Structure formats: structure tokens, C-alpha cells
Curated annotation (Swiss-Prot):
It is a multi-pass membrane protein. The system is composed of three essential subunits: KdpA, KdpB and KdpC. This is Potassium-transporting ATPase potassium-binding subunit. It is found in: Cell membrane. GO terms for molecular function: P-type potassium transmembrane transporter activity; potassium ion binding. Part of the high-affinity ATP-driven potassium transport (or Kdp) system, which catalyzes the hydrolysis of ATP coupled with the electrogenic transport of potassium into the cytoplasm. This subunit binds the extracellular potassium ions and delivers the ions to the membrane domain of KdpB through an intramembrane tunnel. Keywords: Cell membrane, Ion transport, Membrane, Potassium, Potassium transport, Transmembrane, Transmembrane helix, Transport. It comes from Bacillus mycoides (strain KBAB4) (Bacillus weihenstephanensis). Signal peptide: none annotated.
Amino acid sequence: MIWVAVVITMLLFILVAKPTGIYLEKAFQGSKKLDKVFGPFEKLIFKITGVKGYNQTWKQYALSLVLLNGFMIVVVYFIFRLQGVLPLNPAHIEGMEPTLAFNTAISFMADTNLQHYSGENGLSYLSQLIGITFLMFAAPATTLAIVMAFIRGLAGKELGNFFVDFTRALTRVFLPIAFIAALVFVALGVPQTLDGAVTAQTIDGAKQSILRGPVASFVSIKELGNNGGGFFGANSTHPFENPGQMSNILQMMLMMLLPTALPFTYGRMVGNKKQGRILFVSLFMVFLLGFITITTSELHGNPVLNGMGIEHVQGSTEGKEVRFGTVFSSLYATVTTAAETGAVNTMHDTLTPIGGLVPLVNMMLNTVYGGVGAGFVNIIMYAIIAVFISGLMVGRTPEFLGKKIEGKEMKLIAVTILFHPLLILGFSALALSTSLGTDAISHSGFHGLTQVVYEYTSSAANNGSGFEGLGDNTPFWNITTGLVMFLGRYFSLITMLAVAASLKEKTVVPETVGTFRTDNGLFGGIFIGTIVIVGALTFFPMLVLGPIAEFLTLK
């Protein structure tokens, strides 16, 4: 029965992807019906803010993005620092420590939601609502705006206006869908209140303080926007965030909704729907392989316990919630790292070595399917590399969407693709070379190495999940992961926007018999191979020293 539920869940992922992709294309490219519904409200916003809506160059678009996001980071930083004297603080929580406030503000603006604090006792309701939830809408709206400009550039059109795209992402996508999802979560038992904690009497007569808050509205945008941060420290393992299997499936659907839709949006906007389908199917195969790997490992159980003759038919249940079980915990772990959300319904630090390797690889690739917007930019980056390599092998100038890929584009892509591993491995080496980093490690040996690398991988990929055995709420970890999140977020977005702007100016080369097609199975296979060879092999030495070595040791 459990496998039937898994198949149905995956079919739902597939069935909603195309309709959502069509809706996104209409939402951003203009639709009379949508303009009639949302237009008056958007015009009011533009009038108040003074947005003119003129087309921007890629530099103007990028500058608008950085300035708006930077302003939001500063505002939210001071909210966190001053929450102790601000209203909506029934628990009388004090202001955040400076480096933690720095880390948290960047974390949520970068759509990472790395949390070095426990939500229920680290933030006031005001900080949760005005600080955290606000950024949970603003961060994915930023990247969705960027990806629309990126696709327009690839299609040879004007990039558009950042502020118009940002507003449309909020009004036409995130606000309406999150509102509906929040109502469903309330119906499923997720609390939504501004009241303080309630005191309950336990079975043995003791008194217990049960924390609550505006959780349903928080969870809906947490999953839809691929944010992933928890209202509670336990994240989606907490029964108030994720009461049962229905809420669990809904959360996974929300996480996958936009990342799986974007290939179809792309196909429609560039006039090659088949290429969008090829990208979707290719990535789903990689996703499926990851799920099968982690599930097989977790169901097989802990090799040490197996060697002792201890029977555990449910597999490795350490760190997992009984109400979800091993299979759905494995699926959730695959989804949350494939969609770069970072929400967890099981503790990733307790996964088996190979089970923990799958989320780690998903984040290292940062492209299966990746988070809202940013992940799709990486997908096209790998697609262009696949075309470039194929062109070199046959001695032909590579073309993508009928436009020649030349030195300028490949230099930008080369720098972008190297920057991701440089952040992860460079900062991991720094942490391992100083006691400021190693003192946080709770496990010696191979697993300790994986804890460190996982933290920086999660930060660079804007995921936010963690091997929570790491004691990371220290100035060193707060500052270094904050820098990695910021650089990992904005560097690739800006460089790939420059690539799109460069391709926009090029004339379309007529298709000939020798043109390498990017809308068939051959390209899909080369695309997957490029992701594995260029992406995964970059990190292979580290994977051997970490989870693979731990697996062989346990064996």
C-alpha cells in the first residue's frame, strides 16, 4: 500500500507540472483574464512605488535586484536585533545576537532558510511574521522574476523590468497559491493563531507549555517558495507543522510545484515545447534514481545492527517520525534537496551513509530540479555546456536555440560552474583547518567531515537543511555560512543573466541538417551525462572521504 501511495504522489508531481508551467507563462507574458483580475491591484502598487515599467538592460535588472534585496536584509536585520522591545512578543524573547541576526537575515533573503536558532524560542511573532514570512515571499519572487528575464533573453526578447516581474510573482503566483494552501493546512490540523503558549496537564499530572502561533500561513509559503525554514526548531517533523501523511504529501507537492513547472514555461516562451519536455523528463530520471538509492539504503538499515542480528523490518528508523515511515521520509528527503527547499521531516544527520549521500549530491548538483528560478538557471547552464561539448566533439560551432555559443558565454558559464564547488570546498577546508570550525563537529572521522561539507553545500545551494549534530550557532559559522549563502545566491544569477543578455543580441542561425537538436532523447542523455560528469565528479574526492568511506567502514 505504501508503494501505491508513493506512485500516486509522484504522478501528482507530474500531472500538475505542465498546467502550472502554462499558468506561469501567462502570468508573466500577459493574459487578458489575469490582467483583468490582478491588473488594478498591480497598477495601484506601481503608482504608490513609482515603478514605470520600462525595459531594463541586464545591468539595470541585476542592480535593481541587489539594491532591493540588500535593503530588505538591512531592515529585517534590525527587526531581529530589536525584537525584544518590539510588539507581538508574548514570550518576551530577547533580540538576536549580531552574528546570528546577520546569518538569519541573509539566510531568508537568499531563499536558504539555514537556521542556527530554534524558531519557537528564538523569534517573536513579529519577527516570524514581518521578518521571516515577509522574506519567504520576497526571496522566491526575486528568483522567479530573474528566471523570467533569463528566459526572455534566451528567446531574443527584452529582459523586462525587475520591479514589474517581482510584483507579478507576488500577486499572481505566491500570494494566491500560498493563501489557498494555508487554508488547507488549517483544515489538516496546522494551527494559525497569534495567541501565546497554552499550558496543558500531562497524563502523569505535570504541566507542559505548548507553543503555537501563525504556523499554517508560515508552512504554506515555506514549501511553495522552496524556503524550508521551520516555525519550530524540529521543522516538519513537528506535529504542528506536519500533522500527518496528507499534510506531508501536500508539502512535497508544494515544494515540487514551481521547479517542475519551469521547464514547460521555458518551452512555451522560447517556442520549443519539446525541449522543455526533454529537460523535465531527463531531470525526473535523475530524481527517481536518487529516491531509489536513498530508499534502498534506508530500508536495508544500519549495517552495524544488521551484523548483530537485530531485526528491523522498517529499516533504519533512527531520526524518523513513525507517522511518516521510512519510505515517505526518504521521499521527503529527496524532494527537499532536489527542489532546494531544506524543510525536513527526518533528521538528515541520522541517515545511513549512502542515504545521506543522496541529499548531499542533490545539493552539489543544484539542478535536479533546483529551487524556484535559481535552479532552472543552473539547468540551462548545464544544457548549454552539453551543447558546447557536443559541438566540440563533431567540430562544429555549438548552437543553442539557434544562436551560436561563443567565447564570451562560455567564459561566464565556466566561472559560474566553478564558483559553486569553490565556495563549498574552500570554506569547508577553512573550517577544518581551524578550531573555530572543528569545535562544532559532534562526530569524529568520516561523518564529522560530512557534517562540515553538508553545512556549506546546503548554504551554497541555498537549501538550508543540515546535519544538525553540528554546533553551528557560533560567530565563525554564522559569518562564514552567511557569506557563502550570499555569494552562492547572487553570483550565479547575475552571471547567467549576463549570458542571456549576450544571447539576446545574437541573430538566429537557420537550422540545417547538421544542426545538433536539443529536443530529442539523444540530447537528454548527453544533458544527464554532463550533469553527472561536470557536476558530480567535481565533488567525488570529498564524497569518497565522507559518506562513501563511512559506508565502507560500517560494512
